[in-house]
């Protein structure tokens, strides 16, 4: 019998590009974009207060794992810039991991330590690690945006050859 689907919630800049790249990963069964980590209930694009633009990911743990998702997340956005990705500046575009349980928190903290130790980014990781709260689904026009507009705006790119080594003594 297959394992139950697991959930991950990540923020790393504009949600269009994050969704388009993460949705393609083996084991990812569904994605949706929205707002989380902030102060406004029923957040919308025009009124999302201090929320981050985020992506909710459902994945099959028999086909991929949380660590693999995080490694890809750290490859496709710059986790060393605070409240910014490319031309997008502001709290909405911060880097954050919203964990659903203590195991995800531990994996997130270990992965961040590995990213910092790797020297793959020019500065230390500023990614926030917070418990997941309400996730407000974005409007339909934001869902699957780059599927509908393949030449639309994105500041997220896979970096060929980017491989995250585990720190010496880490569980990786």
Swiss-Prot record:
SUPFAM superfamilies: Peptide methionine sulfoxide reductase. Transmembrane segments: none annotated. It is an enzyme of class 1 (oxidoreductase). GO terms for cellular component: cytoplasm. Keywords: Oxidoreductase. It catalyses: L-methionyl-[protein] + [thioredoxin]-disulfide + H2O = L-methionyl-(S)-S-oxide-[protein] + [thioredoxin]-dithiol; [thioredoxin]-disulfide + L-methionine + H2O = L-methionine (S)-S-oxide + [thioredoxin]-dithiol. Belongs to the MsrA Met sulfoxide reductase family. This is Peptide methionine sulfoxide reductase MsrA. It comes from Streptomyces coelicolor (strain ATCC BAA-471 / A3(2) / M145). The gene is msrA.
């Amino acid at each position: 019998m297959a394992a139950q689907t697991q959930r991950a919630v990540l923020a790393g800049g504009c949600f269009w590009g994050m969704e388009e790249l993460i949705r393609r990963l083996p084991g990812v069964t569904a994605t949706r974009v929205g707002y989380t980590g902030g102060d406004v209930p029923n957040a919308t694009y025009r009124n999302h207060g201090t929320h981050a633009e985020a992506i909710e990911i459902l994945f099959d743990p028999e086909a991929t794992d949380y660590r693999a998702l995080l490694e890809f997340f750290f490859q496709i956005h710059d986790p060393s810039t605070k409240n910014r990705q490319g031309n997008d500046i502001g709290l909405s575009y911060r880097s954050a991991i919203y964990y659903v349980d203590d195991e995800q928190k531990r994996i997130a903290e270990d992965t961040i330590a590995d990213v910092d130790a790797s020297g793959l980014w020019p500065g230390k990781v500023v990614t926030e690690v917070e418990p997941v709260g309400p996730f407000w689904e974005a409007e339909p026009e934001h869902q699957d945006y780059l599927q509908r507009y393949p030449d639309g705006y994105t500041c997220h790119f896979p970096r060929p050859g980017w491989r995250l080594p585990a720190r010496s003594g880490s569980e990786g």
